[in-house]
């Protein structure tokens, strides 16, 4: 099991949809989140991409030297950048990070944003471009001098003279819910990602990708992207979920859902269908809450509950074949600690041994001394 955290390069705070309780996302703040994740023993962090975010490659480059073990899941955007240039960027960051780069392949589901970035392709064309892009990208990073002429992309003698540390190349992660996405995942990527739909729906998606990959003689690993709201008791967790959205007006929800409706992303459509823009009945499966998706694009569901309940839901997804869990919570700095302290002890190794104390060569005692004389009692 690989447990990731998330860098909130598009904003952070205590509530959704309001400036109340918001905090500036400065480099120093992102450094705190990344170093907390590194110290606590998270496997890596996802850095989001898009016009609502700071640039993921610049952020990763700034944070790599400030962390020791943490891996960075950074987006590439086929159709926006040359596959050869993208491959060289990946090789350099992998080399400079000591092999800590992971690649998130993003086709882009917002036509308005895509046009702003210079891409006027429709849904099927974007997947055609992504397929051609990855054929070039993968071969370049394996040391080939690539000649390729496809429907959308053409290169001659494309090469990267400085190879990546990871072989054959930094692992490719990718998410999508359409047939075209499942075909691409089965053919070209290492880890297929899904957003946090109910387990039965996730099982169907994984089975479909698994079957398509088998027909191509490949195996694909799986991951899931979820928010999490964990507290000592279930009652506290559900109260925190309600508090997270208490400042969102109905007008803000309507505006957000109108914006999402222009997307041609099947995954975004499935996220929106879980709540239909309504505040009532947001628990769509045991301990799975769709409230985040009222105003947030992309991952819109959260695991909500006490540590045992959250760990049970994680195990439920793991039993389906999920190996990588990418979590986030508001605010991301405090919640990185809370999740590690409350849930890590209930997860498989190495997380159980970390127990929220993180990776350290200190043997204890941990906690404040009592009366300036006695060590704290072990629990």
From Swiss-Prot:
It comes from the Bacteria. It catalyses: an alkanesulfonate + FMNH2 + O2 = an aldehyde + FMN + sulfite + H2O + 2 H(+). Catalyzes the desulfonation of aliphatic sulfonates. GO terms for biological process: alkanesulfonate catabolic process. It comes from Pseudomonas syringae pv. tomato (strain ATCC BAA-871 / DC3000). Keywords: Flavoprotein, FMN, Monooxygenase, Oxidoreductase. The gene is ssuD. One of its GO terms (molecular function) is alkanesulfonate monooxygenase activity. InterPro entries: Alkanesulphonate_mOase_FMN-dep, Luciferase-like_dom, Luciferase-like_sf, SsuD_RutA_monooxygenase. HAMAP family: Alkanesulf_monooxygen (MF_01229). This is Alkanesulfonate monooxygenase. It holds the Pfam family Bac_luciferase. Belongs to the SsuD family. PANTHER family: ALKANESULFONATE MONOOXYGENASE, ALKANESULFONATE MONOOXYGENASE-RELATED. Its EC number is 1.14.14.5.
């Amino acid at each position: 099991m690989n447990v990731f955290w998330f860098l909130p390069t598009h904003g952070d705070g205590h509530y959704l949809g309001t400036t109340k309780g918001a905090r500036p996302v400065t480099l120093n703040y992102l450094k705190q989140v990344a170093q907390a994740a590194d110290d606590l023993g998270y496997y890596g962090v996802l850095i989001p991409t898009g016009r609502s975010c700071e640039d993921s490659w610049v952020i990763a480059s700034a944070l790599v030297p400030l962390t020791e073990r943490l891996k960075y899941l950074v987006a590439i955007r086929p159709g926006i950048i040359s596959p050869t240039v993208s491959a060289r960027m990946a090789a350099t960051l992998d080399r400079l990070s000591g092999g800590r780069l992971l690649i998130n392949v993003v086709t882009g589901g917002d036509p308005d944003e895509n046009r702003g970035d210079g891409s006027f392709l429709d849904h099927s064309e974007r997947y055609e471009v992504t397929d051609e892009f990855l054929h070039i990208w993968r071969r370049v990073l394996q040391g080939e001098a690539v000649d390729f002429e496809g429907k959308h992309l053409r290169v001659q003698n494309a090469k990267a003279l400085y190879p990546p540390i990871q072989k054959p190349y930094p692992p490719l992660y990718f998410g999508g819910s359409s047939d075209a996405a499942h075909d691409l995942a089965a053919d070209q990527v290492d880890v297929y990602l899904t957003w946090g739909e109910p387990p039965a729906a996730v099982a169907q998606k994984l089975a479909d990708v698994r079957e398509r990959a088998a027909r191509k003689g490949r195996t694909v690993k799986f991951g899931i992207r979820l928010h999490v709201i964990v507290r000592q008791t279930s009652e506290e967790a559900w109260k925190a979920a309600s508090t997270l959205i208490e400042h969102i007006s109905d007008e803000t929800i309507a505006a957000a859902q109108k914006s999402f409706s222009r997307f041609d992303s099947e995954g975004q459509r499935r996220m929106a269908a879980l709540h239909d823009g309504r505040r009532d009945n947001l628990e769509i499966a045991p301990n799975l809450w769709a409230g985040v998706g009222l105003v947030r694009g992309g991952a819109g569901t959260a695991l909500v509950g006490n540590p045992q309940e959250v760990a049970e839901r994680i195990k439920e997804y793991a039993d389906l074949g999920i190996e990588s869990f990418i979590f986030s919570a508001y605010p991301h700095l405090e919640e990185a600690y809370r999740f590690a302290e409350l849930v890590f002890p209930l997860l498989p190794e190495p997380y159980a041994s970390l127990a929220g104390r993180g990776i350290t060569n200190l043997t204890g005692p941990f906690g404040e001394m009592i009366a300036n004389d006695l060590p704290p009692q072990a629990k």
